[in-house]
Design a protein with these regions (language model features):
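A conserved active-site cap/scaffold subdomain adjacent to cofactor or substrate pockets
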Residues: 60-134, 138
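Short, solvent-exposed amphipathic alpha-helical segments in soluble enzyme
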Residues: 2-6, 29, 53-55, 83-88, ...
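Conserved NAD(P)+-binding/catalytic subdomain of aldehyde/semialdehyde dehydrogenases
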Residues: 6-86, 90-95
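Glycine-rich, Lys/Arg-enriched anion-binding loops that position phosphate/diphosphate groups
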Residues: 117-165
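Residues at or immediately preceding the N-termini of alpha-helices
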Residues: 18, 77, 103, 143-146, ...
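Structural motif
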Residues: 10-13, 34-38, 43, 59, ...
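C-terminal core of ALDH-fold dehydrogenases
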Residues: 152-258
Length: 258
């Protein structure tokens, strides 16, 4: 509410779910039709946005939460275990993956997770246990490069890099909504205090989408102008292109213009 006041928002509607997506796409007696949806939702809201994409700009695909912790044999098992669980507590349809080539690390991390689960509320514990045995889990690879290949193919929403030299690993990561480097940059920090936008693409769409930014609230129009001299300098080229393309009425305006 404070942020809304600061930026001058004057109307707020308390509504959610797929019915909210339909309401802003079509408009109702109480909710006006909108141009664009910004923000995440569960799998149902994400599906609704896709269905209604011809009626409203659905924005980036931001569905159930995802995290990949990319770790090597030098990673701290305690920190890996704690951060691996972060996104898993959002709900049973979230995805939390530990990707590593170190079997020894996995053998240390799993008991730590089990121990930490005893400190968590029953609701969140159930989410995490469900998540780590369905959409989440451990991906054991043969090498760090193979782990990175998996990450780039998966294109996660959140990604933590817990390798011996995270800044050397960074240039190899091509597809991720956000990339958090080192032992002291958990997702929690980025969500609440570091500054990067927490609305990120999910479902593999980090291959083609970026996080929400001010650009999502802006649009631009192309503007062109040619003086008579400028027109004369390029008219022949434009006419030739039109002829090659077989567009007669594209060519006539430049051929016949005085």
């Amino acid at each position: 509410m404070a942020a809304a006041k600061i930026i001058g928002i004057t109307e707020i509607y308390k509504v959610g779910g797929i019915q909210a997506v339909a309401a802003v796409a079509y408009g109702t007696e109480t909710i006006p039709k909108c141009h664009k949806i910004i923000g995440p939702g569960n799998s149902y809201a994400t599906a609704a946005k896709r269905v209604l994409a011809n009626h409203i700009d659905a924005g980036l695909p931001a569905g159930p939460s995802e995290i990949i912790v990319l770790a090597d044999e030098k990673a701290d098992p305690e920190k890996v275990a704690l951060d691996w669980m972060i996104e898993a507590e959002h709900g049973p349809d979230s995805a939390a993956l530990l990707v590593t080539h170190s079997k020894e690390l996995v053998e240390k991390v799993v008991p730590i997770v089990n121990r930490q689960l005893e400190k968590i509320s029953p609701k969140r514990k159930e989410f995490i246990e469900t998540n780590l045995t369905t959409y989440g889990g451990v991906i054991l690879t043969n090498s760090l490069d193979e782990s990175i290949d998996f990450v780039n193919e998966y294109a996660p929403e959140h990604m933590e890099v817990m390798t011996e030299k995270p800044f050397d690993t960074l240039p190899k990561i091509k597809n991720a909504g956000e990339i958090l480097l080192g032992d002291y940059t958990p997702v929690t920090l980025c969500n609440f205090v570091l500054g990067p936008n927490a609305i990120l693409p999910t479902g593999g769409f980090a291959k083609t989408y970026s996080s929400v930014s001010v650009q999502d609230f802006l649009k631009r129009s192309s503007v062109g102008y040619a003086s008579k001299d400028g027109f004369e300098n390029v008219r022949d080229y434009a006419y030739r292109f039109a002829k090659v393309e077989g567009f007669d009425t594209h060519g006539l305006p430049v051929k016949e213009r005085n």
